Amino acid sequence: MGLPWYRVHTVVLNDPGRLLSVHIMHTALVSGWAGSMALYELAVFDPSDPVLDPMWRQGMFVIPFMTRLGINNSWGGWSITGETVTNPGLWSYEGVAGAHIVFSGLCFLAAIWHWVYWDLDIFCDERTGKPSLDLPKIFGIHLFLSGVACFGSGAFHVTGLYGPGIWVSDPYGLTGKIQPVNPAWGAEGFDPFVPGGIASHHIAAGILGILAGLFHLSVRPPQRLYKGLRMGNIETVLSSSIAAVFFAAFIVAGTMWYGSATAPVELFGPTRYQWDQGYFQQEIDRRVRAGLSENLSLSEAWSKIPEKLAFYDYIGNNPAKGGLFRAGAMDNGDGIAVGWLGHPIFRDKEGHELFVRRMPTFFETFPVVLVDEEGIVKADVPFRRAESKYSVEQVGVTVEFYGGELDGVSFGDPATVKKYARRAQLGEIFELDRATLKSDGVFRSSPRGWFTFGHATFALLFFFGHIWHGARTLFRDVFAGIDPDLDAQVEFGAFQXLGDPTTKRQIV
């Protein structure tokens, strides 16, 4: 046929058997990739420190999704929450990965079978003896089956009725674990951060899908609608399927980037808005104030701050800090976090507390400025010493640490004070091991950033694909130069080009 590369899919245009075959093969490739990628990630994943070296710092991509759906144990004897496991059972990380690979192999064999045995009676129209598909009926079947799967997922898996539940955590990502979720049927179910909405929406959408599927199975479309929307053309199916996919991709790009119950901080890392709004900083401050009100010392109050919470309040965990072409995990950038040094409090020579102004997300460098509680600049690291009035040396700034490894240690040496002031721009200060992975010190994005970028990009491409194929199917007669009501058998499978004189015609 001599088809160009971008037209090769026309070989399955009028061939239902092989159309089915290539879709089964596609499922085999997707499932095989998922299982293989999971095994690769498990081979390189270090579960030893879930607090300072969690999965998202190590660049894991499929493990967070498996964990979100209720898997948390490994055949290696470890659990994602840090405990030792003796009997992980079949539904462990390795078990699920293996199941995907086995399923991929079965789909591969099924695809080959359907490619060889393409001319099945089920695909033949009894009236004409020609291959054809009843597309509205197939639509009803798919809608019904996906509705059953959606309902089953929400009513059984998520609720824990028959299944483990899903990953649920507190608003600050500290206490996450897999647990059953009760459906939220009130207005709170529409809050994207309420896990109960996941159960209720799956149940509601599943019921709707089942009813819609039964409707499309039992009611035929009117002839004018059938012809107007080209319901007999497989390219109509392609166009509307692409629409469903790009719509879903845009939705999940949003829920991932802005945060939601479906994208927990513990599994995918913080969002950039949590840095921009000082989300974790405010919670830390609230806890410290609460400790001081209970007559704890500053040191005791800061020592009660969970290391996990302090680690979230560090700009290196902001997914928007990674560059477009900076490949690799966060650990390959600023290094593996080893320990929290503690919270630095800066004071001038009169003893007034000073606060380092934090670096905004989209800055690579930022001036070191220390302000008082009213936001007035009191000290800085000047660019030109000759004209400086607020230098650390002139103001006599000192720093003392509370909590963490340097608890109770203070420094008055200007060089050391400036070093910690620069690091305080980036949030809480951590000791980072850059030697082990030969980390280059340049921030990387988290899986949250990769997922969002990938899905937003492909959603845009698929949007144009929907427009393209929708236009092709709606205006097929115009593009092909062939009247859709023509009483001739036209070999569209071989050629479908504008006014092609070689297109075979046979009067019926």
UniProtKB/Swiss-Prot annotation:
Transmembrane segments: 21-36, 101-115, 140-156, 203-218, 237-252, 457-472
Functional summary from the UniProt entry: One of the components of the core complex of photosystem II (PSII). It binds chlorophyll and helps catalyze the primary light-induced photochemical processes of PSII. PSII is a light-driven water:plastoquinone oxidoreductase, using light energy to abstract electrons from H(2)O, generating O(2) and a proton gradient subsequently used for ATP formation.
HAMAP family found in the cross-reference section: PSII_PsbB_CP47
Protein's UniProt name: Photosystem II CP47 reaction center protein
Short name of one Pfam family: PSII
Gene source species: Cycas taitungensis
Textual note on the cofactor: Binds multiple chlorophylls. PSII binds additional chlorophylls, carotenoids and specific lipids.
Record keywords: Chlorophyll, Chloroplast, Chromophore, Membrane, Photosynthesis, Photosystem II, Plastid, Thylakoid, Transmembrane, Transmembrane helix
Membrane topology of the entry: Multi-pass membrane protein
GO BP annotations, alphabetical order: photosynthetic electron transport in photosystem II
Gene name as annotated: psbB
InterPro entries: PS_antenna-like, PS_II_antenna-like_sf, PSII_PsbB
GO cellular component terms listed in the entry, alphabetical order: chloroplast thylakoid membrane; photosystem II
Subcellular localization, as worded in the UniProt entry: Plastid, Chloroplast thylakoid membrane
